[in-house]
């Protein structure tokens, strides 16, 4: 992605993984570049919740933005739905009890599962982990809508159970049933590394400079089919901020002592808020995570 403004691009800010760090989000929204333009749009790359101290408050804050906010689902957002459905048990690092103990828990979860896996607008794609190398934008959107239909149905709890278990590493249009659903959702919410022929390596260590032999970031797979449309994503705090012509990773680890990043599509401007921008009484996020 170059640094030249795109004529006609609406005023949209894409915001990285919040992870329940509502103080970071409030500090970011208070920045004059955003606060002084109340009509600007706010895109969230997913993982609004979990690991941080205020998952319920974060959901309510984003819900309160109304139509200004566009949110795609991340793996931690799905984690809350999986726990609610009884398909997994909470882990020691999960910080979702404030959602489950809230009087409006049903409203919060219903709002969450109504979010999308992919959004495309203003010549950009928004998704949590990325777009599988074998998919062009139209194919990816069709598959996202297919999975979203299952997540939004009355039998959504059964869908969350169906997501448990392994999935194929390689994509085939012939996949069906639970295997197809797991692959689609895994690609949109968990993918980081692939082999050169596009097989996902979901369990591989994804630390830059230490990729397992034979793997590379999904966005560097040769002949990736969605390379002509810039993709905004998160999910990869160890990769950190990455801005190129074709992709931008906006997960800058606010929940582990880093910063929360916003990226303006119009002119590629970056905003970041870190711990020094938080109220004095706020609990350091890194210590909360360490003790979780």
Please place each PLM-identified region on the residue numbering:
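Divalent metal-coordination and catalytic microenvironments
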Residues: 17, 47, 62, 74-75, ...
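A short acidic-Thr-Gly-centered motif at the start of a beta-strand
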Residues: 1-8, 35, 62-64, 117-120, ...
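Active-site-proximal beta-strand elements of phosphoester/diester hydrolases
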Residues: 12-19, 124-130, 249-250
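Active-site environment of divalent metal-dependent phosphoester hydrolases
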Residues: 19-23, 50-53, 76-82, 133-134, ...
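Acidic, His/Gly-rich catalytic cores of divalent-metal-dependent hydrolytic chemistry
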Residues: 141-292
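Active-site neighborhood of phospho(di)ester-bond hydrolases with catalytic His/Asp-centered motifs
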Residues: 15-16, 42-46, 71-74, 231-234, ...
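N-terminal active-site segment of His-dependent metallophosphoesterases
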Residues: 1-61, 65, 78
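Active-site neighborhood of divalent metal-dependent phosphoester bond hydrolases
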Residues: 56-59, 63-179
């Amino acid at each position: 992605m170059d640094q030249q403004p795109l004529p006609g691009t609406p005023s949209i800010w894409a915001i990285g993984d919040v992870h329940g760090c509502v103080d970071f989000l409030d500090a970011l929204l208070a920045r004059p570049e955003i606060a002084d333009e109340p009509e600007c749009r706010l895109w969230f790359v997913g993982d609004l919740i979990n690991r941080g101290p205020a998952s319920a408050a974060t959901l309510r804050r984003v819900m309160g933005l109304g139509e200004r906010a566009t949110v795609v689902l991340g793996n931690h957002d799905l984690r809350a739905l999986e726990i609610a459905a009884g398909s997994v048990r909470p882990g020691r690092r999960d910080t979702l009890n404030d959602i489950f103990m809230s009087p409006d828990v049903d409203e919060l979860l219903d709002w969450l599962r109504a979010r999308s896996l992919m959004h495309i607008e203003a010549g950009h794609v928004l998704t949590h982990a990325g777009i599988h190398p074998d998919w062009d934008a139209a194919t990816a959107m069709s598959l996202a809508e297919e999975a979203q239909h299952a997540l939004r149905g009355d039998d959504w709890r059964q869908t969350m159970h169906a997501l448990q278990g392994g999935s194929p590493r390689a994509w085939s249009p012939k996949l069906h049933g639970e295997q197809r659903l797991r692959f689609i959702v895994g690609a949109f919410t968990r993918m980081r590394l692939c082999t050169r022929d596009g097989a996902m390596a979901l369990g591989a260590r994804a630390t830059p400079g230490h990729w397992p032999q034979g793997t590379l970031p999904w966005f560097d797979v040769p002949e990736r089919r969605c390379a002509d449309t810039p993709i905004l994503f998160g999910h990869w705090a160890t990769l950190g901020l990455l801005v190129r012509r074709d992709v931008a990773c906006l997960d800058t680890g606010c929940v582990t002592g880093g910063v929360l990043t916003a990226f303006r599509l119009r002119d590629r401007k970056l905003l970041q808020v870190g711990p020094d921008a938080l109220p004095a009484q706020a609990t350091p996020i890194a210590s909360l995570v360490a003790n979780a």
